[in-house]
Amino acid sequence: MAQPTPHAGLQEGLIHEPASEHGGGFPPFQSTTFAAQILWLAIAFGLLYYLMSRVAVPRIAGLLHDRQARLAADLDEASRMKTGADSARGAYERSLKEAQDKAKGIAQATRDSLAAEAETRRKALEADLAAKLAESEAQIRARTATAMGSVREVAADAATAIVERLIGQSPDRAAVEAAYDRTQTVH
């Protein structure tokens, strides 16, 4: 082995050996070893090819097949679930529409019954008011007749008193009432 000799410009402690001591260059480029290198390359490639084709590729193919099968099953399940969800949504929308229609029918029936009830009450109230009005008018006519009868007597008494005071003698009651009746028919 060669003794390390320091060279100028190199750091201390580095060993420099000339290329002639290495044995002739980079081994893969030596022409004497090409045949052995090609043989080992073929053996390594063949072994690697055998391992890949018998071990790795079947495992990868199995994984891909399993993944594809799982995806297909998941897609089928999703399709079934979508179909079920669509039918459930359709049933929900139909039942909602039926419930809305039923609610509208109930509301209309309630409005109709309340309107009929209000109309019945209105007619009963109108009939009651008409009866009370007729009764009141009858009472007014009776009271008017009574009052008019009283007015007739009061007027006759007043006319008799006035005539008696003016002429000094009392007029005939029948004549005073007849005069009053004539004045009432004129108006």
Curated annotation (Swiss-Prot):
Database matches in CDD domains: ATP-synt_Fo_b
Keyword check for NADP: no
InterPro entries: ATP_synth_b/b'su_bac/chlpt, ATP_synthase_B_chain
Cellular location(s): Cell inner membrane
Chief place where the protein resides: membrane
Highest taxon listed in the record's lineage: Bacteria
Keyword tags: ATP synthesis, Cell inner membrane, Cell membrane, CF(0), Hydrogen ion transport, Ion transport, Membrane, Transmembrane, Transmembrane helix, Transport
Subunit structure: F-type ATPases have 2 components, F(1) - the catalytic core - and F(0) - the membrane proton channel. F(1) has five subunits: alpha(3), beta(3), gamma(1), delta(1), epsilon(1). F(0) has three main subunits: a(1), b(2) and c(10-14). The alpha and beta chains form an alternating ring which encloses part of the gamma chain. F(1) is attached to F(0) by a central stalk formed by the gamma and epsilon chains, while a peripheral stalk is formed by the delta and b chains.
Protein name: ATP synthase subunit b 2
Organism: Methylobacterium sp. (strain 4-46)
